[in-house]
């Protein structure tokens, strides 16, 4: 076990650099270092991959709560944690129960074939290797880790057009066809992932995308039912500053500015867009009333003081003291 200081320094540096490097979005890629992927079962536990300096990879466990790093198994080859978004989104690839971790080659999706490691974080030496012809990157896992969703790109030179595929981890087979919104006519999707959020049980994965034209849409992926829905959004040039969250027990997808100001809501299931009503500014009204009362009180005190001085002067004149 090593102390966490050095690793945290690297993680902080990665978080500082990430927003600048990823502000415009980009393909899902595999990253080493940083904060890795967080456990859903054990708060404060993160899995991070780092180079061993000899062409291999170390899988480390960060225990943020206790300030420690546990060095895990040494893996042959270079592997990273799947990562996407604008620098604010955590790593991907860990199942909801924490028993399955997906690692990807850092060369993906810029080269073919595409390589992935799938296994228990505690026994990654025994992980199975998935090798696919073509240009793929990781997208999501179903809650029971039976399905791995992948992004298949048109080519390594064209990462803005792609389709979503599903790989059956039980049969070790890439399933035919694509996972797409049946109401859409496009043969491929187009856009760069900006940020995402996942439902409490891990079934639904909502990803905010920006098209090459600048238009935005949310890709709602049902990882259990192997279905997808695309919700077109109003054009917004500042998508890098948008955060996603789920409300009303997962029934509402809220898109908010990182300042906390709401932008719009999407109703899960119907996919209807609505705009939050502006709340009455009671805080500002209260502050204004308070300031007005303070001014009135100050004015009354000043008037009383001046009145008292006038009375004293008048009394002095009456007594001939002036």
Give the ranges of each region predicted by the language model.
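Residue position within the beta-strands of beta-propeller blades
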Residues: 48, 103, 150-151, 207, ...
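Short loop/turn segments that connect beta-strands within beta-propeller blades
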Residues: 64-67, 120-124, 168-172, 222-226, ...
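A short beta-strand motif characteristic of beta-propeller blades
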Residues: 25-30, 68-83, 125-131, 173-188, ...
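Cytoplasmic C-terminal tails of single-pass
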Residues: 307-322
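Short coil/turn segments that connect the beta-strands within blades of beta-propeller domains
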Residues: 43-45, 97-99, 144-146, 201-203, ...
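Repeated scaffold domains used in trafficking and secretory/extracellular systems
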Residues: 28-41, 78-93, 133-143, 183-197, ...
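Short glycine/acidic-enriched loop and turn motifs that connect beta-strands
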Residues: 51-56, 106-111, 153-158, 210-214, ...
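Selective detector of the "anchor" transmembrane alpha-helix that sits immediately C-terminal
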Residues: 282-303
